[in-house]
UniProtKB/Swiss-Prot annotation:
PROSITE patterns: N6_MTASE. Keywords: DNA-binding, Methyltransferase, Plasmid, Repeat, Restriction system, S-adenosyl-L-methionine, Transferase. This is Modification methylase LlaI. GO terms for molecular function: S-adenosyl-L-methionine binding; sequence-specific DNA binding; site-specific DNA-methyltransferase (adenine-specific) activity. It catalyses: a 2'-deoxyadenosine in DNA + S-adenosyl-L-methionine = an N(6)-methyl-2'-deoxyadenosine in DNA + S-adenosyl-L-homocysteine + H(+). Its EC number is 2.1.1.72. The keyword DNA-binding applies. It comes from Lactococcus lactis subsp. lactis. Belongs to the N(4)/N(6)-methyltransferase family. The keyword S-adenosyl-L-methionine applies.
C-alpha cells in the first residue's frame, strides 16, 4: 500500500537500535501503526499492542497480528470448495442504492476515485465479507484478513497519486484495470501471542490505559491529515454510510490529529511523553517535521531517566505529497529514532504526613491537561504530588503549616547524603530506637525548649506514633513515641526524592494568598484539603493550628470559583461520601458549576475512603 510514512524500509533500522541499546522486554506497542508493518515485523518476538486512530489501519493490523500466516479458511473451503478469494472474484453484483462506494466515489457522484465497474465489485465484496463473518463462516482473524486484503486491493485500482485527498480528472491506466481481491502480504511467524491486541483510539488517550516494555512511536511528521488522505479506505472499512462533503467526498465527522497541527504538535508530544507507561520509548521522527528535532529531544530529556536521550540517524527518502508546506525543499530527509528510558518512578516523600497522595499519584496525573507550564501544589504537605510532576517551567510548593514547610524546605534543599548524616547524628546522640520512650522524650524536650530546628522535628517525626505531627496550643510538639525507626527504607526515600520540574519555588502561607493571576493559563493548581467527612490525623486537635471545618471548606470553594472564572485550571482532591456522611457543600458546588468528577479510587488504610478528583477542564476535546 502506498502510505504516508510507511516504515517498511526502516524495519532493520528499528531492529538495530533495539539491539544497540540492549532493549529487553516482552511487550511491544506500535502506537501509530499505519499499515501495521512494524507490528508485523516484531510479532514473532513480542506480544504486540497495535494502535491507530484510523479504523482501516486497525483492520490491517488485526489481519497481521491475529494470524501467524495467511489464513487457510478451512470452514469456508469446506462449505464452498474454493478459497474466499476465488469465490469473491467470481461473484456478480447488481447496483443498488445501498452500495455506498458505487454511489459516492465514482462518476455517478461526479467523483473519479474508482470506475463504476470496480466500485460495484468493492461494495459487493465488502458486504459479502461482513455476511460471512456474521454467519460464522469465517473467524474474526479471517474476517480481518479478508477485509484488509480488500482494502489493499482497492489501492491498486484507485485513480489517485497515492492518497485520497484528490482524484485525477482523467483515468490513469491502473484505475482502468478490472478489480480483483488479492491476499494481503504479511510476514509469517512460528506463532503469534494470544495477547496481541489492536486498538482504534487516540494514542494520547490509550497510553493512559496500557503499559508495557517497549513503545514505538511513529506520529505524523507533517500537516497532512491522515483522516483526509485515506477517507475512502476508512469509509470502505467502516461501511457506515457517512455524510460526505465537497468535491472530494470527505467524511463530515472525522478526527483530526493534533500531531499534524503546528500549534498543537508540541503539546501532543508533551502529553504523550508524560503519560506513556512503558520502560523503553523509541520515537521515529525527521529533520523535516513540524516540531524541530532539537526541541523534541529536549522535551524527551525532561521525562527520561537521568535526562539521557539517544538520537540514532538514518538516511531516508522523502515521500511525495500534495502538501508543499512541509517538504524539504531539496534537503535530504534524515530519519532518526529518539530513544530514552522513561522515568516511571513515583518517588515517595521522605516526610510521612497525614493525607499524602503517594498511592494515587499515577491516577491523578492521568487527568492532567496536555500542556503544563507550572504546577502549583497549593496545599503541599509532604510534596508527594508536586515533586513528582514534570511541569515544563517550574513547580510551586505552598504550605500553610510553618513546621511542615520548614521540614520540606530542608528536604528539598539539602543534599541527600548530608540529610541522612544529620539524622544519623541525632539518632546516635540520643540513642533513639523503636519504642524508646525515654530517649525520644529527651529529644522532644530539647526540641520544644532549646532547639526548634527542622532537622530535630524531622527526626522526631520519624520515631513518633503513626508519624502524626501534633502540637499543643503553645506550639509545643506533643506526639508520643511510636513503633518506627530511621532505617534503610527512609534512607532510600531521601536518596530517591528528587523534584522533576526544572525549577522549584517554595512558598509559606495559605493557598488564599496565592495570586493566581500571576500565572499563565497553562498553569495547573492542585488542592488537597483535609476532608470534611473523614477522620484524619491533621484534624485531630487542630495540630495546634487552624483546623478544617465547613467555613474553611466554603472559603476554598469560593477561591476555586474565582480561579475558574479567571480562566485558570484546577484539580481538587476530595471525598463526597464516607461512612454515611455526605459533603453537601462540595456536591452542590460541583453540580452548580458543572465541573468534572473523576473517581480516583480507595485510599487510606485505617480509614478507607473513595477519593475523587474535581477538575474544571477537559484534557481531550469533546
Amino acid at each position: 500500500m502506498r502510505y504516508l510514512g510507511n516504515k517498511t524500509n526502516l524495519l532493520n533500522f528499528i531492529q538495530q537500535v533495539i539491539k544497540k541499546h540492549d532493549i529487553q522486554g516482552q511487550t511491544f506497542a506500535d502506537l501509530f501503526a499505519g499499515t501495521g508493518s512494524v507490528g508485523d515485523y516484531f510479532k514473532g518476538e513480542y506480544t504486540v499492542l497495535s494502535n491507530d486512530y484510523m479504523y482501516f489501519s486497525k483492520v490491517i493490523s488485526e489481519a497481521k497480528l491475529l494470524n501467524s500466516e495467511k489464513p487457510k479458511f478451512d470452514s469456508f473451503v469446506k462449505r464452498y470448495g474454493k478459497t474466499p478469494f476465488q469465490w469473491l472474484n467470481e461473484r456478480e453484483y447488481t447496483p443498488n442504492d445501498g452500495y455506498f462506494v458505487y454511489n459516492n466515489y465514482t462518476p455517478r457522484a461526479e467523483r473519479m476515485y474508482l470506475t463504476e465497474e470496480n466500485a460495484l465489485k468493492i461494495d459487493g465484496m465488502r458486504l459479502d465479507i461482513e455476511e460471512l463473518f456474521q454467519e460464522g463462516v469465517i473467524s474474526k482473524a479471517e474476517y480481518s484478513y479478508l477485509l484488509a486484503s480488500l482494502l489493499e486491493s482497492v489501492t491498486k485500482v484507485s485513480n489517485t497519486s497515492g492518497t485520497y485527498q484528490a482524484f485525477f480528472k482523467f483515468w490513469e491506466s491502473r484505475a482502468l484495470k478490472k478489480f480483483t481481491i488479492m491476499p494481503l502480504e504479511m510476514k509469517d511467524s512460528l506463532s503469534v501471542s494470544k495477547d496481541n491486541r489492536c486498538f482504534n483510539k487516540n494514542t494520547n488517550r490509550l497510553v493512559r490505559e496500557i503499559s508495557g516494555d517497549i513503545a514505538y512511536i511513529d506520529p505524523p511528521y507533517t500537516i497532512t491529515q491522515y483522516t483526509n488522505s485515506y477517507h475512502v479506505l476508512e469509509t470502505i472499512a467502516r461501511y457506515d454510510n457517512p455524510e460526505l462533503f465537497g468535491k472530494t467526498g470527505r467524511r463530515v465527522k472525522r478526527e483530526f490529529s493534533g500531531y499534524s497541527n503546528k500549534s498543537k504538535a508540541y503539546y501532543e508530544f508533551e502529553d504523550l511523553f508524560r503519560q506513556i507507561n512503558f520502560t523503553h520509548v523509541l520515537v521515529s521522527y525527521s529533520n523535516q517535521s513540524i516540531v524541530p528535532l532539537d526541541e523534541l529531544v529536549d522535551l524527551a530529556r525532561r521525562f527520561a531517566v537521568d535526562g539521557i536521550v539517544e538520537v540514532e540517524t538514518n538516511e531516508y527518502r522523502e515521500y511525495s505529497t500534495n502538501n508543499s508546506s512541509m517538504k524539504g525543499e531539496g534537503k535530504k530527509l534524515q530519519e532518526v529514532i529518539i530513544y530514552f528510558k522513561k522515568n516511571l518512578e513515583t518517588n515517595k516523600s521522605p516526610l510521612n504526613y497525614a493525607g499524602s497522595k503517594d498511592d494515587v499519584i499515577p491516577r491523578i496525573f492521568k487527568l492532567l491537561p496536555k500542556h503544563v507550564t507550572t504546577f502549583v501544589d497549593a496545599m503541599g504537605g509532604a510534596f508527594n504530588v508536586g515533586a513528582n510532576r514534570t511541569a515544563l517551567n517550574k513547580v510551586v510548593y505552598n504550605e500553610y503549616h510553618p513546621f511542615v514547610f520548614e521540614m520540606m524546605q530542608m528536604i528539598v534543599n539539602t543534599p541527600a547524603d548530608e540529610l541522612i548524616r544529620n539524622v544519623e547524628q541525632i539518632v546516635t546522640r540520643y540513642s533513639l530506637e523503636k519504642k524508646g520512650k525515654e530517649a525520644f522524650n529527651r529529644l522532644r524536650d530539647h526540641y520544644n525548649n532549646e532547639e526548634q530546628t527542622p532537622i530535630n522535628l524531622y527526626t522526631l517525626n520519624i520515631y513518633s506514633f503513626q508519624n502524626i505531627l501534633r502540637f499543643n496550643q503553645a506550639k509545643k510538639y506533643n506526639t508520643p513515641i511510636g513503633n518506627n525507626e530511621f532505617n534503610e527504607g527512609y534512607k532510600d526515600r531521601i536518596t530517591r526524592f528528587v523534584t522533576r520540574a526544572p525549577e522549584v519555588e517554595m512558598r509559606l502561607g495559605s493557598y488564599s494568598a496565592i495570586n493566581f493571576n500571576e500565572y499563565d493559563d497553562d498553569t495547573v493548581f492542585y488542592f488537597d484539603p483535609p476532608y470534611l467527612v473523614t477522620t484524619a490525623g491533621y484534624n485531630d486537635g487542630k495540630r495546634g493550628f487552624d483546623g478544617w471545618d465547613a467555613e474553611q471548606e466554603a472559603s476554598l470553594l469560593k477561591y476555586l470559583t474565582e480561579l475558574d472564572s479567571a480562566g485558570k485550571k484546577f484539580m481538587l482532591s476530595n471525598v463526597l461520601e464516607h461512612k454515611g456522611k455526605t459533603n453537601h457543600l462540595l456536591m452542590e458546588w460541583i453540580q452548580h458549576h458543572g465541573f468534572n468528577v473523576n473517581t480516583i479510587g480507595e485510599t487510606g488504610i485505617k480509614y478507607p475512603r473513595r477519593e475523587i478528583l474535581v477538575t474544571n477542564y477537559n484534557t481531550f476535546e469533546r
